[in-house]
Each structure stands twice: as C-alpha cells, then as structure tokens.
C-alpha cells in the first residue's frame, strides 16, 4: 500500500512540475479586513449607525446569510467564485494563517515595500517616503533576459510609482 501511495504521490508531483506557469498575478488590498474576506458581512458593523445612513435593512437584505461561507460569497462574489477557485487566498487568521509584515508599521508604503522587496526596512516609515532604495522582485524579474519587457504592475495609488521604482 505504501508503494502505491508513494508512486501516486510521485506521479502527482511530476505532473505538477511539468505544468508551465504562464503568469504570476499578485493582488493586494489596502484596508480590507480579513474578517469580511473570510466571514462576509459583519453584523456589528452593519448595525453601527456610523456605517450606514440610519437604516441597515438594505445591507442585511443584500449581504446577510446564515453561514460565513454564504455571507462572504454575497459580499465578495468574484473573490470566491473566481480568485479562490482558480488561485489562492491567504490570511484566514481563524485557522492560524497569519500574513503579517515584519516591519513595525501598520500603514501602506512600508508594507508594500516589504512585499515587493522581500524584507522590512524600518527607515521606510512614511507613506510620503522617497523612491524605494531597494530592488523589487518586479525589477529583478524585468532584468532577467527571458522576462525583459514582460513584467507589468498596476496600482491605484500614486505611491506605487515610488514603491516599485517607476519614478
């Protein structure tokens, strides 16, 4: 039985290694809580008058369901029907899947710099920081002969030009 299992495991690994990866897409979000990604609508927030215009009925009608799985599908349908089905999601703290940065700051530029360079730099301590002094993984890949000119980035925040050294 062990031999059959080992052969099956080897063939599975061989098949996985033979698949050619065409693209790598990294999607990050800023300010999105993991609780909503994995649990859907948070009733405490929906009931809080600071977050609605006096009537939360519409919010509950649109996004509430009996289970976390149903609620998250209602709140983030593309994430759960496409991204989770065809890619990978990380950061469900309920199951100990912590995706933390190593830097001591809890704001954007230092975190994105760490994601893109692979290490924390405590001198990057402001969202107004100058262009990133470090080579990002995207820059490194673009310097490789086979990938030159095939690396792209999109960011909806002006600081990404500095973080990714596009200025």
Regions found by a protein language model. Name each.
Residues 4, 31, 157-160:
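Short, internal active-site loops enriched in acidic
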């Amino acid at each position: 039985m062990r031999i059959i299992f080992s052969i099956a495991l080897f063939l599975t690994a061989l098949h996985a290694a033979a698949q050619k990866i065409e693209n790598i897409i990294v999607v990050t979000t800023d300010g999105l809580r993991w609780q909503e990604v994995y649990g859907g609508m948070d009733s405490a927030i929906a009931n809080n008058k600071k977050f609605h215009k006096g009537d939360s009925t519409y919010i509950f009608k649109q996004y509430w369901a009996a289970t976390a799985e149903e609620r998250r599908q209602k709140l983030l349908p593309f994430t759960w029907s496409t991204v989770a089905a065809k890619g990978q999601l990380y950061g469900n703290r309920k199951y100990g899947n912590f995706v933390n940065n190593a830097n001591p700051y809890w704001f954007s530029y230092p975190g994105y710099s760490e994601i893109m360079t692979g290490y924390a730099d405590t001198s990057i301590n402001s969202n107004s920081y100058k262009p990133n002094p470090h080579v990002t993984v995207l820059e490194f890949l673009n310097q490789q002969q086979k990938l030159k000119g095939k690396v792209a980035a999109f960011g909806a925040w002006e600081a990404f030009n500095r973080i990714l050294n596009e200025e």
